[in-house]
Design a protein with these regions (language model features):
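N-terminal lobe/hinge region of extracytoplasmic solute-binding protein
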Residues: 57-107, 137, 203-205
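Extracytoplasmic/peripheral linker and loop segments enriched in polar/acidic and small residues
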Residues: 400-411, 416, 438-504, 525
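Gly/Pro-rich hinge or "lid" segments in bacterial periplasmic/extracellular proteins
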Residues: 90-94, 174, 179-233, 237, ...
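Structural transition elements
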Residues: 329-363, 380-383
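Surface-exposed binding/hinge segments that line
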Residues: 104, 114, 148-191, 212
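N-terminal secretory signal peptides
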Residues: 1-20, 26-32, 40
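Long beta-strand-rich cores associated with HINT superfamily self-processing modules
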Residues: 502-525
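Ligand-site clamp/hinge motif
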Residues: 226-271, 283, 391-392, 400-402
């Protein structure tokens, strides 16, 4: 399938809507959300039916079910079906109601949300404004050290104005507020958190309630009969598993062990697209960036010249061709076309440039070369393969790379502990580019796995975050992209066109720009 065929369905569908919504929300215009739910994806066929079990195979195992502390996409994929957010992004790129049924600006530094009055937590507690205030004030309290706090630094506090109304007070205008609400925070219940460890026993108001978690095997969710949206959800249960690799997932789909899988071997996509009786794929929708993290907190990559040497050595096109089989787009930025944030900026345009890389190594006193480690999750075989290709590329400038695939938990432990030189990763939070750069590069962020600390970086990121005008943010963004490319602790090499694979009878599952796996509207024909 050509690049044009893969992207033309995405390119024109959300740009005007996205810009309109950001203009209305971030600029402070009042907005009332109409209706209670988003429309079903257009590609779903027939009338929804109740019943059945969705057997899901994701890429990686979850490790933490507490929305305040969870940092891995694999955890979010599960618990986002257990909890609800105040607002969501639908498959058309619009912000739509969640637990908030409407909202309006109160001056330029406050928002008031009217909440639904019929939601119930899975422990039987009625949902009220107090739960929203508790969720966010828990998040904002620095003593709790919640990593998600970085997404909401301009929020001074959240107060209940009544049983079903809350006010968000801001220290200053906050451009990406609604993108953050739609992506980063689920509403929790104080009593539930006190009674059981939320990292292991999630309790939300979502469409499915948590049943069991058999470590290293599966997680089971079942329909919540008191869900606040009438008739939803449709499925009886969802069983999440995380097989070791793409081939195992595909075999499981073909044999019926699974009826929904997150990925397939990329080289087999053209063949699988013809097997319409056995399976189907969702429309390819949003991208999410794949990148290298260079550990700037210790030698050798505390030296910018050596970070730049890596950036000038890698061949993005070769990586995409040999590893991702053109299911990725070659890019140096986290939000390429068709994102309205696309800039086309590439500080290393014309690369790879091996002579320039060798000169940078020599300037840094490493003309004789380096020996480095590459940290990667073993459950993500494409990133393992990326490391193998990278190893061959770096040999050309005298760098030896030891590829170290680790199980998810150990990988995360070493990533957080910064016990690596280079690590492969991908990011699932790009509704607004602030959600990529601020957590990954700001010195205050627990997500700054690169250990990159810079007053200039913080200054630039703060300016981008605390500007409400969409036009002003768009104007400053290209230079922000270029500056971080030149600093080089994060090296974006591609963006994936996300699509899901499933049995033909699975309906109502499509990628969202938030990249959450939300099965509220999914049903079995």
């Amino acid at each position: 399938m050509s690049e044009q065929e893969r992207t033309e369905g995405v390119a024109g569908s959300t740009r005007r809507q996205w810009l309109a919504q950001m203009g209305g929300l971030a600029a402070g215009a009042g907005l009332s959300a109409l209706g209670g739910t988003a429309a079903r994806p257009a590609w779903a066929q027939g009338q929804p039916k109740r019943g059945g079990v969705l057997k899901v195979a994701t890429v990686d195992k979850p490790v933490n079910m507490d929305p305040g502390y969870a940092q891995l996409y694999s955890s979010l994929q599960v618990y986002q079906n257990v909890y609800n957010k105040l607002v969501y992004v639908d498959d058309k790129g619009q912000f739509v109601p969640g637990l908030a049924r409407s909202w309006k600006a109160d001056g330029d530094k406050a928002w008031v949300f009217d909440l639904v009055d019929n939601a119930v937590f899975h422990n039987g507690e009625a949902f009220t404004a107090k739960d929203v205030a508790f969720t966010f004030n828990r998040l904002l309290d620095a003593k709790n050290k919640l990593p998600m706090r970085v997404f909401f630094s301009p929020v001074e506090g959240v107060e209940a104005l009544g049983a079903h109304q809350v006010r968000f007070s801001l220290s200053r205008p906050f451009g990406p507020l609604f993108a953050m609400l739609a992506q980063a925070t689920e509403i929790v219940n104080e009593k539930a958190l006190a009674e059981k460890d939320p990292k292991l026993f999630p309790v939300g108001t979502g469409p499915y309630r948590f049943v069991e978690w058999v470590k290293d095997d599966h997680i089971t969710l079942e329909r919540w009969d008191k869900y606040f949206r009438p008739g939803k959800p449709y499925l009886d249960r969802i069983i999440f598993q995380a097989p070791a690799d793409d081939t195992v997932r595909l075999t499981g789909l073909q044999t019926g062990r699974y009826n929904w899988i997150q990925t397939v071997p990329p080289q087999r996509i053209p063949e699988l697209e013809r097997q319409t009786r056995e399976m189907k794929s969702s429309p390819g929708r949003p991208y999410f960036p794949f990148y290298l993290m260079l550990n700037a907190s210790r030698p050798p990559f505390n030296d910018k010249r050596l970070r730049q040497a890596i950036a000038w050595t890698i061949d993005r096109s070769e990586i995409v061709k040999l590893v991702y089989y053109d299911t990725h787009v070659v890019t140096a930025e986290p939000t390429p076309e068709p994102s309205p944030w696309a800039t086309g900026v590439n500080a290393h345009k014309g690369g790879p440039n091996l002579e320039k890389a060798k000169q940078l190594l020599a300037d840094a006193g490493k003309a004789s070369g380096l020996t480095l480690t590459y940290l990667v999750k073993s459950q993500v075989p494409v990133l393992v393969k990326t490391g193998e290709i990278l190893r061959e590329q770096l040999k050309k400038v005298g760098i030896t790379l030891d590829v170290r695939p680790l199980e998810s938990g150990q990988y995360f432990e070493e990533l957080v502990g910064k016990k690596f030189d280079i690590a492969g990763g991908y990011w699932s939070v790009t509704v607004d580019p602030d959600m990529f750069y601020y957590p990954m590069q700001h010195s205050s962020s627990a997500w700054n796995f690169c250990g990159f600390k810079s007053e200039e970086a913080d200054k630039r990121l703060d300016a981008f975050r605390f500007t409400a005008s969409p036009a002003a943010r768009k104007k400053m963004y290209p230079e922000l992209v270029r500056w971080f490319q030149e600093e080089g602790s994060l090296v974006v090499f591609s963006n994936e066109l996300q699509r899901y694979w499933m049995k033909p009878n699975v309906q109502g599952s499509t990628p969202l720009s938030s990249l959450e796996l939300r099965f509220e509207d999914t049903w079995l024909a």
